[in-house]
Amino acid sequence: MAMNENAYPTTFPSFERENHRDALRQPFDPAFRRTWSNGVALRQLVDFARPTVANHTMSYALIEYCLSRLPMQHLERLGQLKIPVELHAAPFQYLQKHHRACGFDWVERFVWRTHDLHKPYNFLRPELLLAQESGSQRIVALLTIMPGEDYIRHYASILEVAQHDGAISSHHGPIRCVLYPHLTQSMMAWTGLTELSLSVEPGDILILGFVAELLPRFASLVPTARVIGRQDAQYYGLVRLELRPGLVFSLIGAKYSYWGNLGGRVVRELAARRPRAICYIAKQGTLLSPGDIHRTIYSPTRYCVFDKGQACWHGDDHSALPINPLSSRFPTFDRGLHVSTPTIVEQDVDFRTQVEAHGASSVDNELAQMARALTDVHEENPSMERVQLLPLMFITDYLRRPEELGMTVPFDLTSRNETVHRNKELFLARSAHLVLEAFNVIERPKAIIVGTGYGVKTILPALQRRGVEVVGLCGGRDRAKTEAAGNKHGIPCIDVSLAEVQATHGANLLFVASPHDKHAALVQEALDLGGFDIVCEKPLALDMATMRHFANQSQGSSQLRLMNHPLRFYPPLIQLKAASKEPSNILAIDIQYLTRRLSKLTHWSAGFSKAAGGGMMLAMATHFLDLIEWLTSSSLTPASVQDMSTSNSIGPLPTEDAGATKTPDVESAFQMNGCCGLSTKYSVDCDGAADTELFSVTLRLDNEHELRFIQRKGSPVLLEQRLPGREWLPLKVHWEQRVREGSPWQISFQYFAEELVEAICMGTRSAFADKATGFSDYARQVGVFGSKVGIA
């Protein structure tokens, strides 16, 4: 008895169901089963040694991965009913329409729902069907997949692992695979890509991969962009986005997975339209370090296709290999040779050893196939302008070495883990920036860092994280230290003047993190040169007159003149402020900062000298005053300070002169309290020579509730709340992204730097300046306490 389609949950909306019924209307030869399909056993199709958990780079997760790709609940039930399973490389609509030519009296969908209709693309997945063989009452289950040689082998290998593990019944012997070669060969035509690609204009930049996620990001980053064309077909979608006259991004999404060499077929079809470039933003695995998972962008320039343990195509052998337009700007993104292989199941430790011997650093299933397809197109059409290939790859797993199989690796190939989602969002945001920069839609700044302490430890990695090219590094007396840092990070100009680096490398962003008494001269030099956005560490200068002069000189400038006050960009403190709801709700703010910074020092340094701008007041006080102003949306004045005291607990320290010592003439600790706004009281307790590391901010609200941020070194950030007469409890907040681990000063600077770079790239300096702390704000903040500590 035939099954009623309406009795089972459909996986498509009604309009989409009708489209699928009309698909693949090809005439059939009555001898179809003999001429247009062929059946083989799994082992024939897989044709590589079946891996085990003992020799696969996924180790214990191999079985879990394979079973997660199959409808195991239904396959187990089918096994109990002794219903055999076949793998068919054809979509359901094809088999249903032509079921008699395929040898079945009827074919219907089973209840397994595999289609995620919340996703606009890449949602079509293998389906489980039931069919009755012609001329008998024998029922068979058909696992149907989209055709494509590599995709077929991939699913065949998954089934083989599952059957060998006992998860799928072996009652009927090896699983039979039925192939439809004509569907594979004509796939670009019957899926509609050939027709859809006619809407692509020569010179377009094509975006593949995470297109639905990137479209709103492109539109947000380029507010003047406009959609000039949109198509939605059965298997694809196209949006043409004009960034500026003459520059169009064509974002093409596929509703199925163009796995392995299908990716090459897609790219070859699109290359016929003569686009300027094809950008592929997707995920891959790494052979380099598990620390790269979810964190590091890979953008290869060299490619190799591997199959059955052999390199069957190597891009190094071809002069027509596509160029990566980003490689010259960000050479560190090119980690080495990229390898593509038909199936993840093939990636056992022997495979890893073989590809590593070829110099491989990363692996996926289709990127090298795309590079191969473009290379073939270039070689077949030597007179055509070559199509560029820009891959931006998100690392989701690490291929372990034989000795590492016991290692726990935080991979998540399904990308359903919450942490993966958060890091994927960061990757997509950065990828959107990088694609726009690669085609000169936006331009990242080129930076000079002055200072090899905080400058190299904190500023440099934060800028590199955002893709900023650091073109100059200036240090102090220890030139060898500066050269070593510069060489390590590929910085071209070492201890070269600002004017020269600006002239030779186009430097336009300056970070001043030198010794305190050198800040003023550097800021003045940059202001006189012009053309620099400036971010200065505290202090801006050692006297109020110079600070006010810089503030006045910066008035009306379209460029940024900022102090490094990053706490207002720190997500935990942003959440603390949000939890207070309104600044007027805050009755009191208590800030405590304890650090071993000074007590760890065993020799005299400029930090202990008033003449050199040392002491905790100049180093830290404005951080806390700035935080108070931000929390209360108010400005402090000298009258805001009711009481202030300083102290020094550091004794004489040895100097460079043998036997000589010096006693600090600045404070190692300070306390201050007062009022701000209409009625908010504040207190600050800062000790630079404490025996612990602690930073806390406590808010007392007008409803008698208390909120607290607290961070101890080596411990996670705590956000807490306390009701009257109760214990401290965790504050429930919604994090848009995982808070990075590390010092609040380093991490808050990373967030500050990210927004800074985006503001410069997108021409939104004014809005960012309103959010940050400028020279004039800083001069006013120092004026709150300056006269009390001898800063005139």
From Swiss-Prot:
Keyword Protease listed: no
Pfam families reported for this sequence: GFO_IDH_MocA
Record GO cellular component, one term: lipid droplet
InterPro entries registered for this protein in UniProt: Gfo/Idh/MocA-like_OxRdtase_N, Gfo/Idh/MocA_Oxidoreductase, NAD(P)-bd_dom_sf
Induction statement: Expression strongly increases by addition of L-alanine that activates cordycepin production, as well as during the development of fruiting bodies. Expression is positively regulated by the two key transcription factors Kruppel-like factor 4 (Klf4) and retinoid X receptor alpha (Rxra).
Gene3D superfamilies: Dihydrodipicolinate Reductase, domain 2 (3.30.360.10), NAD(P)-binding Rossmann-like Domain (3.40.50.720)
Single GO term (MF): nucleotide binding
EC number annotated for this UniProt entry: 1.-.-.-
Superkingdom of origin: Eukaryota
Keywords in alphabetical order: Lipid droplet, Oxidoreductase
Keyword RNA-binding on entry: no
Subunit structure and binding partners: Interacts with cns2.
Role description: Oxidoreductase; part of the gene cluster that mediates the biosynthesis of cordycepin (COR) and pentostatin (PTN), two adenosine analogs with related bioactivity profiles as both mimic adenosine and can inhibit some of the processes that are adenosine dependent. Within the pathway, cns1 catalyzes the last step by converting the cns2 product 2'-carbonyl-3'-deoxyadenosine (2'-C-3'-dA) into cordycepin (3'-deoxyadenosine).
The protein's name: Oxidoreductase cns1
Organism, as annotated: Cordyceps militaris (strain CM01) (Caterpillar fungus)
Lineage of origin: Eukaryota, Fungi, Dikarya, Ascomycota, Pezizomycotina
